[in-house]
Amino acid sequence: MSSDMHLFVTVGSTNFDELIKYIDDEQFHFFLRNLGFSYMTIQIGNGTYIPKLIYTNDNNINNNKLLKEVKYFTYKTNLDKYFEKAHFILSHSGAGTTLECLRKKKKILIVVNHKLMSNHQSEFANYMHSCNYLDICNNLQNLKQNIHLSLKKDTYNAFPQADAQPFLKDLYNLIYN
């Protein structure tokens, strides 16, 4: 694994304070550093927990043990630059974020938020995992192990590019036939 890797964590518009609290920990930062990560950007969405371990190399007294930089934000209108910069993405199981990451050919680990009203995210994540597009973490206690295994995994199936033609053909047939 290369050094100076960038981790992007996104929870979309949901509240996923459990995930944010879990990664806001010196041991987790140390774990990431040992895997070759130097940077972590966290999108906290609608959560109420604000990460406390936010730093750059300049204000990090443990700079040889932790990451070079950790920053966070609530929302941005466009996440493309964060997806592009990331070597690895930890994400909630939102379909939009997941599909965007897969279309950009990014390695993604879905962390299922079991506190949401229905388990549609879990169903979606399990389906995408069964197609070998990504890996999932169903329990935060296994997050480090899941990250490690996902980073070691070499082959995922390529996510197919969007093709509007079948839809347009069906729409045309509905309108004109």
Residue ranges with predicted function:
Residues K107-N139:
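Nucleotide-sugar donor-binding patch of glycosyltransferase catalytic domains
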Residues T14, T74-T77, H92, K115, ...:
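Residues at secondary-structure transition points
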Residues I42, S150-N177:
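C-terminal amphipathic helix plus adjacent low-complexity
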Residues M5, E69, N78, F88, ...:
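Catalytic phosphate/metal-binding cores of nucleic-acid and nucleotide-processing enzymes, i.e., regions
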Residues K71-T74, L134-L143:
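Short acidic-hydrophobic, aromatic-tinged amphipathic segments that line or gate anion-handling sites
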Residues L79-S118:
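A donor-sugar binding/catalytic signature common to diverse glycosyltransferases
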Residues S2-K85:
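Donor-nucleotide binding loops and adjacent catalytic segments primarily
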